[in-house]
Structure formats: C-alpha cells, structure tokens
Amino acid sequence: MQKNLGAALPSTVWEAARAGQTQQVEALVQQGTPVDARDPEGKTALMLAAMNGHTATAQRLLALRANPALVDRDGLTAAQLAAQRGHTRLVELLEAAR
C-alpha cells in the first residue's frame, strides 16, 4: 500500500499546485514528494502554480526550495509561463527568487 501511495504523490502534488491548494502541496512535499518533480510535459509544481496564478502556492514552493530556474519541455521557466497568462505579480516574485 505504501508503495502505491508513493507512486501517486507526484501527480497529486501537480494537481494540488494547479488548483492552488497550498497546504496540500506543502504536506505532500514534506511527505517526500520531490519539490521539483516533473509532470509528463516537464512542468514542476511551481510552474503549474505560476501559470494558474496561485501566488501563495508559488511562495510556499519557493520556501520549500523549488527551483525557479528550471525549464519545461518547451524551454519555459515558471516566470515565463506566468507571464504568458498575465500574472505580473508572480513574474516579479519568480524573477526575484532567481
């Protein structure tokens, strides 16, 4: 059972980040999900939070040492993904964290 739970953690953290569920993201990372785990498109939880405008989730991921300099399969950083969707405050936060 624990093995299956561990296998499900990365997809769960991606879903939580995409939905802006900050406390769930933090709990999953503390349970052992790598903070920079990538989804099939190469996106991290930080990228998913950023592109969906979830500032509090992005701040928490940065505090958990998520790397804002990573790029997805298209070569885009979390800041660039946020910029594409007009999330200016997130762009500033992510650029300052680099």
Annotate each predicted stretch with a short phrase.
Residues 24, 56-57, 89-90:
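Conserved ankyrin/ankyrin-like repeat signature
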Residues 26-34, 59-67, 95-98:
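Ankyrin repeat domain, specifically the short helix-to-loop turn at the C-terminus of the second helix
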